[in-house]
Amino acid sequence: MAFGVSIPEENYDALVQYVDEAYKDFDCTPIYSVDLIWDGTKDLSSKAFAEIADEEKIWGKGVEDPLIAIEGFRIYGKQLRLFGLEKGKPTLNIQLDDGSSLVKFKSSEEEYELLHSDLGYVIINAVGTCTRSNWGIPQFMITDYEIIGRNEYYF
């Protein structure tokens, strides 16, 4: 069922004030029910991503891909790449030392700037799933993330 509502234009500001007041204590923070929590300072690796991604044959028919949280992951500037802008499909790629990566589709230059640091690192918590790329490389597909800190070095 669908319906519509209209209000006189002169009442618009009053409605906005009313809604703002009514929902001022409402927490809009996303909440995820995850299957596993990894320590972003030590648990991330191609092997860990592969172990979960390679179980893809059991997902489906009521069994969803496991949703994984990564806590306290540091992104250094040299790890972060943004590509696909010219094709209209901006994608962030965070390369790990072992060749695997964390990937976020539907990104932007603004998001890249938020996560990039030339003089230190940005710390995030993220949620997502493990997959393999088209080339068979294990990767972590970021569903959502939050920036929890940053460290800039000044000399």
Predicted segment positions?
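Acidic, two-metal ion nucleic-acid-processing modules in DNA metabolism proteins
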Residues: 1-155
